[in-house]
């Protein structure tokens, strides 16, 4: 009997996302319920954004939750390497096989040509897609260009008509017209694969039998199915999981909800409660109980109990469930966990240099730096009153800085400062006009340790959470303001 093998394949391009943890949990439970194996693979082909620091954060976040893997970059295994950036020769080999078999082709189109193609198609009211012009090149012309070292990509051929049937373990057969599919790039001009080729090759070579992934990938499933057909490989069983949603039913995003697992760890949530809550996202125990452990979820896991309605990720409900877990701890364990959370040595070492020079006794540390150990702050609206800025301008400054910080890929003091500086310059203000607002929102005080250092230490999710909290206190942002300010944001460098 074939061993069930599932996997999670996150990209190390930022803080570990709760959506990644959610999909990892369901893959883990499915594998373990069937006595199988769970694999961790790192999709780091985006060399500009991928970092080893983010990769380590993924490892740490999953392990904090209690999710372990049988094979992966840090534990090894018989199907490595487990980082896609280390598998370049493998992908090149299989891409060449597709070209030789007539299932893929070399494309030498420049970015300018592709942009013109898209513009012309849009002008005609057509859906932009590659028009296949490289297929008209003769074999001799293709070879001449390859020999000359012209930049190129490899694209897959797709049918122009007919229906692809996607067998989904949750929805049954899903029919998707082939005319919605583009001639997908498989190998980029930097020699690295796109998601589609790497995903299929890796899942096959690693013996993955079942793939549970987010439903946002369902519309592009025909491309993956066609690649399996081209290679002559057996396709894993597919399951497209419902996406996590904000309370307003929109897709879970950092603009409306803290999305980093690290944020919830920093806020003092228990990993058991976090995992329990993620397990309730679209799934339920047979007896409908709300509180259950990972072991209990594995024991009773059944895909048929997954609801297709978008599960709502609500921090208030998570907090309630976390309270249930906390209050049931033995007092000794509660105290031990509290001490471990509050006096994390690595975190304390980040904070200590910024408070040591400003206190005369240890008892003064808490009033000065207590905000480092809090989640939501009790903010005072008076702290946001400005002699120079109107109430509307105050909200505008905070909102624009929040938006700029949301696009920040590397969370460093210099880059945080750059975001704030860009906003104040665009509004023809001075840095000193904005910094009191940052002190008020981030520390809950009129002054404290360097707020820029504090923002770097607190991290992106907690910083953005507090800025959103400040905006809510000040009345929020109207739809009209949101539209006007987003236009202004687009003009800020």
Swiss-Prot record:
Pfam families: Anticodon_2, tRNA-synt_1c. GO terms for molecular function: ATP binding; glutamate-tRNA ligase activity; tRNA binding; zinc ion binding. A motif ('HIGH' region) lies at residues 10-20. SUPFAM superfamilies: An anticodon-binding domain of class I aminoacyl-tRNA synthetases, Nucleotidylyl transferase. One of its GO terms (cellular component) is cytosol. It catalyses: tRNA(Glu) + L-glutamate + ATP = L-glutamyl-tRNA(Glu) + AMP + diphosphate. Keywords: Aminoacyl-tRNA synthetase, ATP-binding, Cytoplasm, Ligase, Nucleotide-binding, Protein biosynthesis. One of its GO terms (biological process) is glutamyl-tRNA aminoacylation. ATP binds at residue 254. It is found in: Cytoplasm. It comes from the Bacteria. A motif ('KMSKS' region) lies at residues 251-255. The keyword Calcium does not apply. Its EC number is 6.1.1.17. Catalyzes the attachment of glutamate to tRNA(Glu) in a two-step reaction: glutamate is first activated by ATP to form Glu-AMP and then transferred to the acceptor end of tRNA(Glu). Monomer. Belongs to the class-I aminoacyl-tRNA synthetase family. Glutamate--tRNA ligase type 1 subfamily. This is Glutamate--tRNA ligase.
